[in-house]
């Protein structure tokens, strides 16, 4: 099991870029897709979330990121290299989660961290809709980078 050192940065870089792009896609395109705005009799604008569209949008976004990463970005990597690289990103996510949970009033100045947690966070949102909110969802969603592992090659060519 030899891991090429130049491949260790690929999954963390891809996850951070994909999370940032997912954040902006959700904010700008998602608003037009799953937010329903109506004007009631009194002339007030009410905004509601269409939950079916929300689930479809987030599921599609998660799968697009997963498939683009697995089929394009990590094509030349072995399964072991992807697992090690994804493990690095998972450890970073779990450290940040530990800091967030240990500080009762997590500083709002560090809100920028949320942008880089968007892609794995989609998984926890979808699981929370099915199972209900639970603290374990915060931990399991950060294992999402490990889902790239089956897309790797069995050995280096």
Features from the language model and the residues they span:
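Canonical alpha-helical transmembrane segments
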Residues: 50-79
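Membrane-interface helix-boundary motifs at transmembrane edges
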Residues: 2-7, 70-84, 154-157
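Hydrophobic alpha-helical transmembrane segments
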Residues: 12-13, 52-62, 83-87, 123-145
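Membrane-cytosol interface at the C-terminal ends of transmembrane alpha helices
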Residues: 64-74, 92-99, 144-148, 152
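Membrane-interfacial helical/loop segments at transmembrane boundaries in membrane proteins
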Residues: 38-42, 107-128
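Transmembrane alpha-helical insertion/packing segments
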Residues: 1-58
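Hydrophobic alpha-helical membrane-insertion segments
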Residues: 14-27, 84-106
